[in-house]
């Protein structure tokens, strides 16, 4: 007659319970991963924006229209301007943020919050993940980006403010695809003479077949570049004009 000890039965039950717990954890994790996130924008609101440079630095505040970015009905960021769909899953949008403008001597007072413009954010509709986009030489006051696919074209400003660059950057690529020096200190002074937002140059113009972008800081500095993946070439028409000018 076969005899089964109580210890063997308890050991088997323990293994079954452990296996069941592992299955529950794996199923829960799989469900959490597959659960879609709800990405939405809230209503537009007008706020006062006091730039640290430009006309607003010593004048009355400028008006900035912002709206919240919500993930699963929770506010994650504030944004301004239109969003650009990179793929069905990813889109980019510019960030708006509040900074504490209180002085050290005002530490006992409530924080003095001021709205400022930030850089670009990359949003994943599936995971709900939000991350900053690396745009070399992008100036949050003077630069305005024109998007095509996963490329951003804009006029960047050097850290000392003495150089203006035509830049094409690609998402998830550290180095820019294009970085052309438009002008030195004199050109920078001319371009920024108005001290207005987004005044580094005209908004770059994209065209397709082939993908190409035109930069125009002023009538004498107009160039069109053809973008092929990570490489860039000056448009043949621009090359002919430069040769004729020599």
Please give the residue ranges for each predicted region.
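Bacterial N-terminal signal peptides
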Residues: 17-28
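Short coil/turn segments at the loop-to-beta-strand junctions that recur within blades
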Residues: 136-142, 183-189
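Blade-terminus and WD-like Trp-Asp/Gly-His loop motifs, strongest in beta-propeller folds
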Residues: 81-87, 143-151, 198-213
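Hydrophilic extracytoplasmic domains
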Residues: 200-246
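Beta-strand C-termini and the immediately following turn/loop, strongest in propeller blades
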Residues: 94-97, 111-114, 154-160, 215-220
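Terminal domain-start segments
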Residues: 31-113
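N-terminal secretory signal peptides that target proteins for export/translocation
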Residues: 1-13
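Surface-exposed loop/turn elements that mediate protein-protein interactions on large endomembrane-trafficking
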Residues: 45-74, 115-133, 166-185, 225-243
């Amino acid at each position: 007659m076969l005899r089964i000890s109580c210890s063997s039965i308890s050991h088997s039950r323990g293994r079954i319970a452990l296996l069941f717990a592992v299955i529950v954890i794996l199923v829960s994790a799989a469900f959490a991963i597959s659960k879609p996130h709800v990405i939405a924008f809230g209503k537009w609101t007008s706020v006062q924006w006091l730039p640290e440079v430009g006309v607003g630095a010593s004048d009355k505040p400028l008006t900035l229209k912002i709206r919240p970015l919500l993930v699963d009905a929770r506010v994650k960021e504030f944004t301004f301007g239109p969003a650009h769909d990179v793929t069905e899953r990813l889109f980019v949008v510019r960030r708006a943020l509040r900074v504490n403008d209180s002085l050290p001597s005002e530490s006992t007072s409530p924080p003095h919050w001021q709205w400022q413009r930030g850089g670009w954010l990359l949003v994943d509709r599936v995971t709900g993940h939000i991350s900053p986009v690396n745009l070399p030489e992008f100036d949050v006051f003077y630069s305005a980006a024109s998007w095509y696919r996963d490329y951003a074209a804009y006029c960047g400003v050097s850290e000392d403010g003495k150089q203006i660059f035509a830049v094409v950057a690609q998402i998830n690529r550290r180095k820019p695809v294009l970085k052309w020096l438009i002008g030195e200190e004199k050109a920078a002074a001319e371009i920024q003479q108005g001290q207005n937002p987004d005044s580094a140059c005209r908004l770059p113009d994209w065209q397709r077949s082939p993908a190409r972008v035109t930069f125009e800081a002023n009538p004498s500095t107009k160039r069109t570049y053809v973008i092929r993946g990570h490489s860039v070439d000056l448009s043949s028409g621009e090359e002919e004009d430069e040769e004729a000018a020599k």
